[in-house]
């Protein structure tokens, strides 16, 4: 990944975090890494943890299709690691934020 792509993704993740804060979420972590994968944003609202995958594009297509079943599998393994590491006993869900042409689309509680 080149610098241009990295900065574009960074901008999208910041836009997503600002959106979540405006909706009453508390941001706990950004870019949490484990040997299993990465979670872009970990947030909390109403005693529920939200593990958020952020996808951005400047093109005219649905970014949701870039979240594959394999990506969700890696996210789930990373969630399990996170929950054990920090000894959380809260409900959680996986959310996706799509940034398409500077517009935020928030898709909550996804499953495959």
Swiss-Prot record:
<comment type="similarity">
    <text>Belongs to the UPF0102 family.</text>
</comment>
<dbReference type="InterPro" id="IPR011856">
    <property type="entry name" value="tRNA_endonuc-like_dom_sf"/>
</dbReference>
<protein>
    <recommendedName>
        <fullName>UPF0102 protein CFF8240_0294</fullName>
    </recommendedName>
</protein>
<dbReference type="InterPro" id="IPR003509">
    <property type="entry name" value="UPF0102_YraN-like"/>
</dbReference>
<dbReference type="InterPro" id="IPR011335">
    <property type="entry name" value="Restrct_endonuc-II-like"/>
</dbReference>
<dbReference type="Pfam" id="PF02021">
    <property type="entry name" value="UPF0102"/>
</dbReference>
<dbReference type="GO" id="GO:0003676">
    <property type="term" value="F:nucleic acid binding"/>
</dbReference>
